[in-house]
Every structure is written in C-alpha cells, then in structure tokens.
Amino acid sequence: MAAPEGSGLGEDARLDQETAQWLRWDKNSLTLEAVKRLIAEGNKEELRKCFGARMEFGTAGLRAAMGPGISRMNDLTIIQTTQGFCRYLEKQFSDLKQKGIVISFDARAHPSSGGSSRRFARLAATTFISQGIPVYLFSDITPTPFVPFTVSHLKLCAGIMITASHNPKQDNGYKVYWDNGAQIISPHDKGISQAIEENLEPWPQAWDDSLIDSSPLLHNPSASINNDYFEDLKKYCFHRSVNRETKVKFVHTSVHGVGHSFVQSAFKAFDLVPPEAVPEQKDPDPEFPTVKYPNPEEGKGVLTLSFALADKTKARIVLANDPDADRLAVAEKQDSGEWRVFSGNELGALLGWWLFTSWKEKNQDRSALKDTYMLSSTVSSKILRAIALKEGFHFEETLTGFKWMGNRAKQLIDQGKTVLFAFEEAIGYMCCPFVLDKDGVSAAVISAELASFLATKNLSLSQQLKAIYVEYGYHITKASYFICHDQETIKKLFENLRNYDGKNNYPKACGKFEISAIRDLTTGYDDSQPDKKAVLPTSKSSQMITFTFANGGVATMRTSGTEPKIKYYAELCAPPGNSDPEQLKKELNELVSAIEEHFFQPQKYNLQPKAD
C-alpha cells in the first residue's frame, strides 16, 4: 500500500494526466485557455475543482456548473457524454438509424466559457448525425415536456433535453428519455456511464457542428410538434363555454425561462383570454436578473413582481413556471388581501380532484373505475389515496421522482388502464398522460380552467381545497431541508438513525411521538411487511428513511439527488369529518420540531437550516 504522501502524488499525477488530455482534445478556445492559464499559474485548488472527478451520469442525466474541466458542463464533456449515449443506444436499438432521437434545449448560457444550452444541443446533434442517426433538433427553445412528448409522438428511440431546470444560473444539465417517453431508470444510467468512459476521445467530426445544417438526417420538428401538442392538449379542456365567458383574470410568470409563449398558446387552445405576463420576467434571460433563485418552489420571494402586477390588473390568480416550464406554482389572492401560495401537495389535491371529477362526468359507467389510476411519489401527500378509497379508483405510490411515475404510468397504459393524474410535492404535475413526465404548461392551463369553473359556483381555489379536505379528510403537510455539503456527515447522520437504540436498532420514538413503523429504502428494510422487506425498489446510493407514527403522522428524511440538501417531508392525515385543521397543524409542528431536534441534530452535524 502506498504511503500517505504517495497518495497525494497519485492525485497530482492523475490531475496532470487529465489536464494533458484536456489540452489535446478541447477545441473551445475559452475553456482551453482557461485551463492553460490555471496550469501556468499553478492553481492546483481550482484545477482540482475542474478536474476532481468526472460528472456522474445518473438517472437524471447530468447537472453541474458550466466551465472548463471534466467536473463541469462544457463543449468537450457534452461531446464525450453524447458519444457514450450514442454507443449505448446503438447496442440497445437495432432500428436507431431508422427512428432517430429528439434534442431540445432551454435558454441557459455562460458567456465566460462559451457554453450555452443551444450550443450543447447542436454539438449533441452533430455526434449522432456523424454516426448516421437521424436527429429531430428543435430550432428554438422549448419546455422540457416537449422532449418526452416528441419521443412518444414520433416513436423515437430516445430524447435529450439540455436544461438545468430551476438551478442557479451557472448550472446546466443533460436529461435523457427512453423510447417509452419516460425518463431513464436503472440500469440504463450505469450502462450509459460505462459507455461514456469508453468513448472519451472526440470522434473526427465531433467539433464541426456546421456539417449538420446541410445533412438530410437533421429534422426540425418545431412547427409540427407545437401544433400536435396543443391539439392533444385540447382534449383536456372540459368547459370551453365557461372559459369563453370567465371574468377570472390571471397573471403568469416564466421566471426568465422558456414558458411564456407556450402558456399563451395553451390558454388560446382552451379559449381562455391569455394571462397577463410579468414584463420583466417574460423573455428568456440566462442571468435571471430579478430573482435570487429562479425556482417558484421557493415561494413568495420569486413571486414579488407577479403579485405587484396582479394587484395592479385586479388579477386574483398567479401562475408561475420554473425556467424550463416543467413545474408550476399557483397563488391566489385571499379576501383579506393576502396572497396564498399553494404548496405542491395542495395543488396536487386540487388538480387530482378536478381531473377525477371531469373524468367522472364523461364516464358514467362505474365499472371503468377498476381500470383507472392516479399516482404520486412516496414523499408526497396521501390525499389521492384518500380520494381513491372513497371514489373507487386505484392509487399507487412510487419512489421519489417523475422517472418512476412516468415509467409506471406507461406500464399501466400498456395494460389498457387509464392514468388520470400523477404528481409530486415538488410542484410537478402530469395532468395529461400524452407527456409521461411533469408538465408545467398543461398544469397551468388546467389550473386556469379549474379556477374559471369554480368561479361560476362562487368558489375560490382555497374554498374548494377546504371542501376536498372536509370530504376526504384533512392532510396537513410540512416540508423543508437542511444544507450539508459533506457526504460523510450525511452518512453519519443516517447511520445514527439506523443504530439509534443500540446496534441495528432504529428509534422507537421521536421525543414524545411513538413510532409504529419504519421503512428504509437505502437498505431495503420495512418492518410493516411480513418479511421485513421493502416493496418499493431500494438504492444504496441515496439515503431515505420513512417513519410512521402512532398519531397518524408520516415523516420521510432523504438526500437530494441534485443539491447539497437533506430534505424532510411530514404529513398528518385525519379521517373525513375531523374539521379542526388548526389542532392538526399544531400537532404537526410539534412533530417536525421533534424530528429536527432528535433526528437531524443540526448542532451536532453542523447543518445549515433553509434560509427564510
């Protein structure tokens, strides 16, 4: 075994090897010069940041800061990733050269490294076309859901979306879809990752993206897909006459992202007057100048300009998409003059109720219920389960993330079942199963029709949400996170929970709250199952433990796949008829405080709480 100082040398030697290779292969003058400069300055610290480890290709693809080096998103790492993905697809699909793939992109850009989503998309297209594979490359920015829609609609082998969704401005990402129109799940991520490692040296034509413009293999699907998407969306318009007459006014923000024109078109498809757009945020801007984080999930801070415009135009409802328009936040002005931002779970309850109610009106035959499904992820509210139990349709829970819901929805559809709706608490909604992923464009217009319909009954969204809780039982939720940049600390925290009451003994209580069941999807343990084995798939690479409490509370602690966060989700579910939400809220707050104090132990592990 090498001496400790030898390991330092080993790292330096590896760094030298990586940078030398980079200088041979990189043809982007900005990133190439940046690396040369760091070498000349002997800036080992910065070089380690850029070359420390290759970005890991997971089921969510890639997501990292743009800049030079194998740890970052740039021209060379995009070429390398795409070469690996291309070789993997060639192995998986014998008809790849007949069917082809789709590629689209958002509006992100990083001038200092010459990187942008559009450029990355063109380089990815160049890689596939150089191998004789047809590429449907959008000529302009689109929402992320347009990629899975195109895969399904044109029956392609795969899709790539270049986006970092609602991440900070310096980031970008590479998200992939399989031929079933859903995000990839394991083992494809491992296979792609291995293929990338085997195809690192750029192929002869990799850098020359000018070649693709004259290639017969390049197709621009923009016009036809735009048309077909909105034609399909029209099938989910249930009250066209109400929409034409409605007096409800809407404000929309695309938070400097891609959503503006698509949401305008969606409203027109539903015969709704298009929403008033927040002028400072409607056009794509990779600098995101008006917000600290371009994420509507962060709540009121992102919506300040929307509220100001809504107050000015007397609009009662604000619709906010994240920058790649796959998520949606909704806020409603209350009689008190305050704005209420609905949580992802609350909007999930409203949309689930609405899509079931609308479906039921068109399908009077009760026997159809046995083939009708709704899905949500294991960290989302169980409100759909409560509605399903009472109404007679099926509810299924999946692991966290739309990759699981999209793949499960496709399985059910292939079995002849109807999937009405799927959602996750992180403001992601699949209202129309022609897109097997979250879609903020369809969710925005369906929310607008719901609000317009309720207005004819003199009801607000808030009043209808209360009616849902009264009928099906209150579901009170609370979610937040702690920030932790150290993987070892995160591991220690979760290992402490697994050995809380002595070796291999999980906690029996959290403060005064007794625990009745524990499911650990990192290890595959579930003590509510007869064989103590979890039914849902397990993953050793991520931490996730769910505690069920004797008082009807459920809390999940898990790591984030894309951010340095340990998240928690807690919910109290009451049976129908329990109409004291304030008491439930008080109890839930006490439970959350106990979890933070006893299970997170922020002082011990030096965790930073979420900033208000």
UniProtKB/Swiss-Prot annotation:
<keyword id="KW-0313">Glucose metabolism</keyword>
<dbReference type="InterPro" id="IPR005841">
    <property type="entry name" value="Alpha-D-phosphohexomutase_SF"/>
</dbReference>
<dbReference type="InterPro" id="IPR005846">
    <property type="entry name" value="A-D-PHexomutase_a/b/a-III"/>
</dbReference>
<dbReference type="GO" id="GO:1904813">
    <property type="term" value="C:ficolin-1-rich granule lumen"/>
</dbReference>
<feature type="binding site">
    <location>
        <position position="322"/>
    </location>
    <ligand>
        <name>Mg(2+)</name>
    </ligand>
</feature>
<feature type="binding site">
    <location>
        <position position="326"/>
    </location>
    <ligand>
        <name>alpha-D-glucose 1,6-bisphosphate</name>
    </ligand>
</feature>
<feature type="modified residue" description="N-acetylalanine">
    <location>
        <position position="2"/>
    </location>
</feature>
<dbReference type="Pfam" id="PF02880">
    <property type="entry name" value="PGM_PMM_III"/>
</dbReference>
<keyword id="KW-0479">Metal-binding</keyword>
<dbReference type="InterPro" id="IPR005845">
    <property type="entry name" value="A-D-PHexomutase_a/b/a-II"/>
</dbReference>
<dbReference type="GO" id="GO:0034774">
    <property type="term" value="C:secretory granule lumen"/>
</dbReference>
<dbReference type="GO" id="GO:0070062">
    <property type="term" value="C:extracellular exosome"/>
</dbReference>
<dbReference type="GO" id="GO:0006166">
    <property type="term" value="P:purine ribonucleoside salvage"/>
</dbReference>
<dbReference type="InterPro" id="IPR016055">
    <property type="entry name" value="A-D-PHexomutase_a/b/a-I/II/III"/>
</dbReference>
<dbReference type="GO" id="GO:0005576">
    <property type="term" value="C:extracellular region"/>
</dbReference>
<protein>
    <recommendedName>
        <fullName>Phosphopentomutase</fullName>
        <ecNumber>5.4.2.7</ecNumber>
        <ecNumber>5.4.2.2</ecNumber>
    </recommendedName>
</protein>
<keyword id="KW-0597">Phosphoprotein</keyword>
<keyword id="KW-0460">Magnesium</keyword>
<feature type="binding site">
    <location>
        <position position="63"/>
    </location>
    <ligand>
        <name>alpha-D-glucose 1,6-bisphosphate</name>
    </ligand>
</feature>
<feature type="binding site">
    <location>
        <position position="326"/>
    </location>
    <ligand>
        <name>Mg(2+)</name>
    </ligand>
</feature>
<feature type="binding site">
    <location>
        <position position="438"/>
    </location>
    <ligand>
        <name>alpha-D-glucose 1,6-bisphosphate</name>
    </ligand>
</feature>
<keyword id="KW-0119">Carbohydrate metabolism</keyword>
<dbReference type="InterPro" id="IPR005844">
    <property type="entry name" value="A-D-PHexomutase_a/b/a-I"/>
</dbReference>
<dbReference type="GO" id="GO:0005829">
    <property type="term" value="C:cytosol"/>
</dbReference>
<feature type="binding site">
    <location>
        <position position="424"/>
    </location>
    <ligand>
        <name>alpha-D-glucose 1,6-bisphosphate</name>
    </ligand>
</feature>
<feature type="binding site">
    <location>
        <position position="400"/>
    </location>
    <ligand>
        <name>alpha-D-glucose 1,6-bisphosphate</name>
    </ligand>
</feature>
<keyword id="KW-0007">Acetylation</keyword>
<dbReference type="GO" id="GO:0008973">
    <property type="term" value="F:phosphopentomutase activity"/>
</dbReference>
<comment type="subunit">
    <text>Monomer.</text>
</comment>
<dbReference type="Pfam" id="PF02878">
    <property type="entry name" value="PGM_PMM_I"/>
</dbReference>
<keyword id="KW-0963">Cytoplasm</keyword>
<dbReference type="GO" id="GO:0005980">
    <property type="term" value="P:glycogen catabolic process"/>
</dbReference>
<dbReference type="GO" id="GO:0006006">
    <property type="term" value="P:glucose metabolic process"/>
</dbReference>
<dbReference type="InterPro" id="IPR036900">
    <property type="entry name" value="A-D-PHexomutase_C_sf"/>
</dbReference>
<feature type="active site" description="Phosphoserine intermediate">
    <location>
        <position position="165"/>
    </location>
</feature>
<dbReference type="GO" id="GO:0004614">
    <property type="term" value="F:phosphoglucomutase activity"/>
</dbReference>
<feature type="binding site">
    <location>
        <position position="165"/>
    </location>
    <ligand>
        <name>alpha-D-glucose 1,6-bisphosphate</name>
    </ligand>
</feature>
<comment type="function">
    <text>Catalyzes the conversion of the nucleoside breakdown products ribose-1-phosphate and deoxyribose-1-phosphate to the corresponding 5-phosphopentoses. Catalyzes the reversible isomerization of alpha-D-glucose 1-phosphate to alpha-D-glucose 6-phosphate but with a lower catalytic efficiency. The mechanism proceeds via the intermediate compound alpha-D-glucose 1,6-bisphosphate. In vitro, also has a low glucose 1,6-bisphosphate synthase activity which is most probably not physiologically relevant.</text>
</comment>
<dbReference type="GO" id="GO:0005978">
    <property type="term" value="P:glycogen biosynthetic process"/>
</dbReference>
<feature type="binding site">
    <location>
        <position position="327"/>
    </location>
    <ligand>
        <name>alpha-D-glucose 1,6-bisphosphate</name>
    </ligand>
</feature>
<dbReference type="InterPro" id="IPR016066">
    <property type="entry name" value="A-D-PHexomutase_CS"/>
</dbReference>
<feature type="binding site">
    <location>
        <position position="324"/>
    </location>
    <ligand>
        <name>Mg(2+)</name>
    </ligand>
</feature>
